[in-house]
Amino acid sequence: MFTAPSDPVNVRKELKVTQLCELCHSRKAIIRRPKNLQKICKLCFFHVFETEIHETIVSNDLFYRGERVAVGASGGKDSTVLAYVLKLLNERHDYGIEIVLLSIDEGIVGYRDDSLATVKRNQQQYQLPLEIFSYQDLYDWTMDDIVETAGIRNSCTYCGVLRRQALDRGAAKLEIKHVVTGHNADDMAETVLMNILRGDVARLEKSTSIMTSSTGSPIKRSKPFKYCYQKEIVLYAHYKKLDYFSTECTYAPEAFRGTARELMKNFEAIRPSCIIDIIASGESFVLKQKMGKQNKKKIITYNDGNRCERCGYLSSNKICKACMLLEGLEKSRAQIKIQVQVPGEPQQEGPAKVLRTLERLTF
């Protein structure tokens, strides 16, 4: 049973409404919840927002006492609110977890350097430990270098693969086995739409999972914001006056996700519940038995337990996606005669540089 906060507060209007809060019936409603159009006051909004996240955490057994948890911190609204709320709920409900901020520096000048400055301020504000790992150190490439070599249209493909592996590598170095990310309901619904548009039905069910992990890896990922609308996260950050970075990534306008996002906006204007509805559809989606068998045939188990033979990262192929992408980049860089000297190694020419591999990852 919901109990509304009783402390009175004067709040600034966001909506021109005259109704009282539909929950406490005592303060003026200033917010219309996007997911159900419920009109509530600011205090009740804080309460239901935090309570819903807590219920998601508890009902899915996301944490256990004594667990070390890394928050994937980018400085944006989602990860900033996630770090704030997770710290708040950990203290309020005594989860007994240790929270660490884990940031990845992709090497995008004018974007990531500014957002990391926000993360460092958050670290001071929330009094949480912070660790930063860079593409430059992990892969000997920055995203700016990758875009210069491979072009902007494929930037999100490269960044998505490398960032996922970078988070795992960072967590492994910190001996942390649980990474939480700020993916929200909008993100998950967009992913479902993207998979449908691409005809990638095999990923539909996985794209809506609140907890994911790779076979053989002790590092799991979870999304406490699975049922949180992006608009509500923005409102929460605004009314809580949280310090976050709001500039879009330099290369994001070329991303295919933008197409799905525009579709979502059109759907939501007609049916506000469409975001949750799409997630529910993904959750209940069952692959045909024939399709399942076809996909299973493509996965080959090797003697080393499905690990990349170059870097040790989990992979269904002999060479993981990251190593394949980096090899292609090195070949392209060699073709345009851009030479990079590897510290401690003799000067190499052309394709010989492709032989350089990532630091071997062990779990």
UniProtKB/Swiss-Prot annotation:
Keywords: Cytoplasm, RNA-binding, Transferase, tRNA processing, tRNA-binding. One of its GO terms (molecular function) is tRNA binding. It is found in: Cytoplasm. It holds the Pfam family ATP_bind_3. One of its GO terms (biological process) is tRNA wobble position uridine thiolation. Its main location: cytoplasm. Its EC number is 2.7.7.-. GO terms for cellular component: cytosol; cytosolic tRNA wobble base thiouridylase complex; mitochondrion; peroxisome. CDD domains: CTU1-like. Pathway: tRNA modification; 5-methoxycarbonylmethyl-2-thiouridine-tRNA biosynthesis. It is an enzyme of class 2 (transferase). It comes from the Eukaryota. Belongs to the TtcA family. CTU1/NCS6/ATPBD3 subfamily. Plays a central role in 2-thiolation of mcm(5)S(2)U at tRNA wobble positions of tRNA(Lys), tRNA(Glu) and tRNA(Gln). Directly binds tRNAs and probably acts by catalyzing adenylation of tRNAs, an intermediate required for 2-thiolation. It is unclear whether it acts as a sulfurtransferase that transfers sulfur from thiocarboxylated URM1 onto the uridine of tRNAs at wobble position. Prior mcm(5) tRNA modification by the elongator complex is required for 2-thiolation. May also be involved in protein urmylation. PANTHER family: ATPASES OF THE PP SUPERFAMILY-RELATED, CYTOPLASMIC TRNA 2-THIOLATION PROTEIN 1. This is Cytoplasmic tRNA 2-thiolation protein 1. It comes from Vanderwaltozyma polyspora (strain ATCC 22028 / DSM 70294 / BCRC 21397 / CBS 2163 / NBRC 10782 / NRRL Y-8283 / UCD 57-17) (Kluyveromyces polysporus).
